[in-house]
Amino acid sequence: MKRTAAFLAMAILPIALLAGCGAPEAPAAPPADPPKGVSVSLAQWRSDEPVHAIEVAVTNATDTPVYFSDVQLVTPSFKTLPPERADALLKRTPRTDLRIPYGAANCSPKGLPSLQPATVVAHLRTGSEPLRRVVFKVPHPDPLLTRLLRDECSAFLITEAADIEFGDDWTQVGKVMRGSLVLTRRSTGVVAVQDVGGTTHYIATPVEKSRPLATLDAGAQRARLALELTPGRCDPHAFAEGKKAFLFPVRATIDGGEERVVIVVPPKPLQERLTAYALKTCGLGG
């Protein structure tokens, strides 16, 4: 028995020693703090709006190049998208824009939400250092994100009650394109269109001048708003800069509440017809 106990003790001892000499601790993760002299802010160009994108404006106030592998906006106010590849080596610069898409706003049927804090997350390398994950805090509340959240959730509240779309009845009458916007019921509530704005290219003129311009009553499934479109500008430069030509702002209310704006975009075939009509009307060909 003593021999057995001694044998077991000798067998257990190396195991205990090995356990006590466990694997070395993993090295600490590199800090997520931004490099000194490198900062970001958010901006949006007109060309970004139709494609739901923003610019991460990077400032590098140092002489050390910084390589951005990818960039991502993270905030509870918008759905988080995967990191957007940047592959950008930035030397000293007062501002260099990195374009990224941003997710849909997280809206609520209860009303407009408040903006939540945001960060810009990037995988970057400073000089010859290894690539690391860095978190830039966006000053809160950011005015651009505040506007984007307000606009998108205002539209959400309207479209929860009714879809507002271009009808299929658009025809050219003389020098005017005539057709309608169609309101189609989705949920409860009286939806009233108070105004239809034009764009950089087109003047929108409601046929009926009384307010509201159209009303989708509580018991109705559909309503129409007769509309006329005419060219807003006829210079070639205007047609070359057509980034927002078809983003028509429609102001509407639900149950007599606050006016909110929803952007209504004609379908592609109608966009092509409107472009051809405007070019011809302006004497620019087409």
Model-derived regions: residue spans:
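Surface-exposed beta-loop interaction hotspot
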Residues: 125-209
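Short, acidic/polar linear motifs in exposed loop/turn regions
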Residues: 61-64, 106, 183-189, 256
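Terminal connector regions
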Residues: 106-147, 234-269
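Bacterial signal peptide processing site
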Residues: 22-24
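C-terminal motif of bacterial Sec signal peptides marking the signal peptidase cleavage site
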Residues: 17-20
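Short, hydrophobic/aromatic beta-strand segments
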Residues: 64-72, 111-112, 133-134, 188-198, ...
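Beta-sheet-dominated interaction scaffolds and their linkers
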Residues: 27-57, 61-63, 146-178, 273, ...
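Intrinsically disordered, low-complexity Pro/Gly/Ser/Thr-rich segments with frequent PxxP/GP/PP motifs
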Residues: 76-110, 203-237
